[in-house]
């Protein structure tokens, strides 16, 4: 959530940022609403002070047996009670209206984020590896998996409907191996603490991660009102919800391998074949909680951690910085890592690493104390995929496919596969 004080002091910056994200200016409306709210707050405070003063005067009047004065003062107290009831209700309504608008506003892009309307304006900043060359026409992952008889969409559809997959045999083991490999690298070498998180969370937790109220239709809600997590970012970020940390404890780095659940409400007709866009998938998530001074350097570090996974797997990729029009709701800056898929002959997103500033910290009321500073500051948060396991499985299948339809197992995964070097039918 954005700081209304910052908006009052920087209305032009807010409107410029919103326009760069393809939204209408909001500063004037917000400032007017905030002025009305603060005016009501001031009126309520004055009325409360007057009511307290009059109550004392009633006692003084009774002490000298001035019943007439006491009665007049009692009438004033009753009038103040009526006024306070009305003014407090109006103040509450104005506060709720202001918070509703603020909750729907996206974060402010950093100055070095390229302006643009969509993904076509993203900027490639580096490449790793070259796309492999084949002496045959490479297949897409769903053809490879079905030819191996270890990837079944028909059975998954009978079980759960569209956008689900049943993996079996070596491909099921490969999926598990990828997740374990990624988590091991992040925990043992990249300095993250492994966390096993709940898959069901409450409203305020999803709100704290800035996925409610805006993205409710993209989530699955249970009959008791809780939400299935769309990413482990949601519970990991909220581990510090409503806490006060010491700056010496920062940065905190968490990583989790978890299932993720998404309704894909806005993806109708896109990537309907295969495993690219599923209602349920595994992902390794990285989350960092930092001070303001640490956050930008942490973004570079986190992105390098995600890139390292793909380098070890020998997968060609490129890293792009997202434009203002393509960036996520809570992000101030985002790097997408896109892996090469020979079957599609294009790069596809496999990881997204974002710095959110204090946007989530403010919603979570998560703060930290600087040394020698009595003032509390909202924490800064970052999140990144390290990486999406299903998409990484796709990339391994397509980049390591052989002419006979078999799949070479990358060297780093062979210990997780019981020494298996090749997957075949």
UniProtKB/Swiss-Prot annotation:
Keywords: Aminoacyl-tRNA synthetase, ATP-binding, Cytoplasm, Ligase, Nucleotide-binding, Protein biosynthesis
Superkingdom classification of source: Bacteria
GO biological process: selenocysteine biosynthetic process; seryl-tRNA aminoacylation
Binding locations of ATP: 262-264, 349-352
Any single Gene Ontology cellular-component annotation: cytoplasm
EC numbers for this chain: 6.1.1.11
Keyword Aminoacyl-tRNA synthetase (UniProt): yes
Subcellular location: Cytoplasm
Catalytic activity: tRNA(Ser) + L-serine + ATP = L-seryl-tRNA(Ser) + AMP + diphosphate + H(+); tRNA(Sec) + L-serine + ATP = L-seryl-tRNA(Sec) + AMP + diphosphate + H(+)
Gene Ontology molecular-function annotations: ATP binding; serine-tRNA ligase activity
Pathway(s) per entry: Aminoacyl-tRNA biosynthesis; selenocysteinyl-tRNA(Sec) biosynthesis; L-seryl-tRNA(Sec) from L-serine and tRNA(Sec): step 1/1
InterPro entries, A to Z: aa-tRNA-synt_IIb, aa-tRNA-synth_II, aa-tRNA-synth_II/BPL/LPL, Ser-tRNA-ligase_type_1, Ser-tRNA-synth_1_N, SerRS_1_N_sf, SerRS_core, tRNA-bd_arm
Ligand binding (L-serine): 231-233, 285, 385
Keyword check for Nucleotide-binding: yes
Transmembrane segments: none
CDD domains: SerRS_core
Gene3D superfamilies linked: Bira Bifunctional Protein, Domain 2 (3.30.930.10), Serine-tRNA synthetase, tRNA binding domain (1.10.287.40)
Role according to the record: Catalyzes the attachment of serine to tRNA(Ser). Is also able to aminoacylate tRNA(Sec) with serine, to form the misacylated tRNA L-seryl-tRNA(Sec), which will be further converted into selenocysteinyl-tRNA(Sec).
Family affiliation: Belongs to the class-II aminoacyl-tRNA synthetase family. Type-1 seryl-tRNA synthetase subfamily.
Subunit structure: Homodimer. The tRNA molecule binds across the dimer.
Domain notes: Consists of two distinct domains, a catalytic core and a N-terminal extension that is involved in tRNA binding.
Name of the protein described by the UniProt record: Serine--tRNA ligase
Taxonomic lineage: Bacteria, Pseudomonadati, Pseudomonadota, Alphaproteobacteria, Hyphomicrobiales
Name of the gene: serS
